[in-house]
Amino acid sequence: MTATILDGKATRDEIFEDLKVRVSALKDRGITPGLGTVLVGDDPGSAAYVRGKHNDCAKVGITSIRRDLPGDITQEKLDATIDELNANPDCTGYIVQLPLPKQLDENAALERIDPDKDADGLHPVNLGRLVLGKKAPLPCTPRGILHLLRRYEVPIEGAHVVVVGRGVTVGRPIGLLFTRRSENATVTLCHTRTRDLGAEVRRADIVIAAAGVPGLITADMVKPGAAVLDVGVSRTADGLRGDVAADVAEVAGFLSPNPGGVGPLTRAFLLTNVVERAERVAASLG
């Protein structure tokens, strides 16, 4: 068996085409969505991520709002920048790029973001709304995972989903999405200290690997025909590596590559969250 590849780049391009139409319709009503980014310091990886997000904005017609700050900035200066974006009517939604320099309090910065402008969908208020089943901006990577599975018609309802990883961006929130009544999956949350991880993963119809451990999920751990999504990213001497070993492709029914699988959809749904908020603003104006 050779796995069907879940092509995140092609799926992202489909989303971008849809967003172009929606942004054009908003502009016809006098509303131009704007994505803001707050980048502190000169970390090459963070700078590349931010640059990619603004390149995406240009493709769909969203205005870019950049706030690039020196690495030695104080918490007070960062807070003032966040407050400015909260109040800026041109900024529909924004993100604070992580990690921040050590002198800054990441949690305090993220909590200061206006929850309605939370483009990442990771503000504590919005995660709380997700727990309660209320409408809120959804976390981008979990949303991208769900969309990719649906795009390739991978059965979700009634599926047993095993998530490996307990981070706030993927591992913790994704179970909340999969167990909604619109998905009706059963979720097991595992991590690197799970006893007999292989036995847990082998029970899965869908495996989401998000632990940040290179090659953690191997072919002998995967049920034949299962869908495997590789979300983990680790920097190694050989470059960036995902959590899924290469031999999984011979066992899985569906496999998201890394890079090129879920990553492009994370960025696509960042823009989607911004456009959706702009549409809510337009609807409120009548």
From Swiss-Prot:
Pathway field of the UniProt record reads: One-carbon metabolism; tetrahydrofolate interconversion
The Enzyme Commission number assigned here is: 1.5.1.5, 3.5.4.9
Record flagged with keyword Manganese: no
Question: From which domain of life does this come?
Answer: Bacteria
Q: Which residues bind NADP(+)?
A: 165-167, 192, 233
How is this protein organized at the quaternary level? Answer: Homodimer.
- Name this protein carries in UniProt: Bifunctional protein FolD 2
